[in-house]
Swiss-Prot record:
Record's function text: One of the primary rRNA binding proteins, it binds directly to 16S rRNA where it nucleates assembly of the body of the 30S subunit.
Region of interest: Disordered: 22-43
Superkingdom classification of source: Bacteria
Organism of derivation: Geobacillus sp. (strain WCH70)
Summary of subunit composition and partner proteins: Part of the 30S ribosomal subunit. Contacts protein S5. The interaction surface between S4 and S5 is involved in control of translational fidelity.
HAMAP family, per the entry: Ribosomal_uS4_B
Keywords annotated in UniProt: Ribonucleoprotein, Ribosomal protein, RNA-binding, rRNA-binding
InterPro entries: Ribosomal_uS4, Ribosomal_uS4_bac-type, Ribosomal_uS4_CS, Ribosomal_uS4_N, S4_RNA-bd, S4_RNA-bd_sf
PROSITE patterns for the chain: RIBOSOMAL_S4, S4
Biological processes annotated in GO: ribosomal small subunit biogenesis; translation
Protein name: Small ribosomal subunit protein uS4
GO molecular function: rRNA binding; structural constituent of ribosome
GO cellular component terms attached to this protein's record: small ribosomal subunit
Disulfide bond residue pairs: none
Gene this protein is translated from: rpsD
Length: 200
């Protein structure tokens, strides 16, 4: 299944989460597209709730179904809680950490920066958005790319870096210091529903 590249606002409204990170999609019309008001949101079945939760997380991180399922299966082989490990693996993606560091305004923009070769890991260019960053590794902007307007604008708007990352804004360099804890990951996701979905 290919990655969705259509209007994120429509998907955000359908799933009830902000994929842009701004929350603007939900401010004006906080109900699914095609409906004429919030009261018409239909009640979902148990399967529907599980599917919706899976789609929320998949679209949030911008991962296609094949990669999403592969990461889920990998998380199941790790010690600890399956759902929590799954979310930690998604959070450790290079494109996501570029976004978390504030080098991009959205994960989609971060993915483009990685794909176009603007991002280094431990000083080496990595152009694979799904690259899994390990604790202790550094993420930086390539010297020739440091004047890109999209990066400057993103850094100006960014006012929060998670505790599992450190950022040197002058050097445009950050370090993934440790794996995140569940309390530091998206609270609007119920990963237990996703585990149930794939266990059917």
């Amino acid at each position: 299944m290919a990655r969705y590249t259509g209007p994120t606002w429509k998907i955000s409204r359908r799933l009830g989460i902000s994929l842009s990170g701004t929350g603007k999609e939900l401010q004006k019309r906080p109900y699914p597209p095609g409906q004429h008001g919030p009261s018409q949101r239909r009640k979902l079945s148990e399967y529907g709730l599980q599917l919706q939760e899976k789609q929320k997380l998949r679209h949030m991180y911008g991962v296609n179904e094949r990669q999403f399922r592969k990461t889920f299966e990998e998380a199941g082989k790790m010690p600890g809680k399956h759902g929590e490990n799954f979310m930690i693996l998604l959070e450790s993606r290079l494109d996501n950490l570029v976004y978390r560091l504030g080098f991009a305004r959205t994960r989609r923009q971060a993915r483009q920066l990685v794909t176009h070769g603007h991002i280094l890991v431990d000083g080496n260019r990595v152009n694979i958005p799904s690259y899994r960053v390990k604790p202790g590794q550094t993420i930086s902007v390539r010297e020739k790319s440091r004047n890109l307007q999209v990066i400057k604008e993103a850094l100006e708007l960014n006012n929060f870096v998670p505790d599992y990352l450190t950022l040197d804004a002058e050097k445009l360099e950050g370090t993934y210091t440790r794996l995140p804890e569940r309390s530091e990951l998206p609270s609007e996701i119920n990963e237990a529903l996703i585990v149930e979905f794939y266990s059917r």
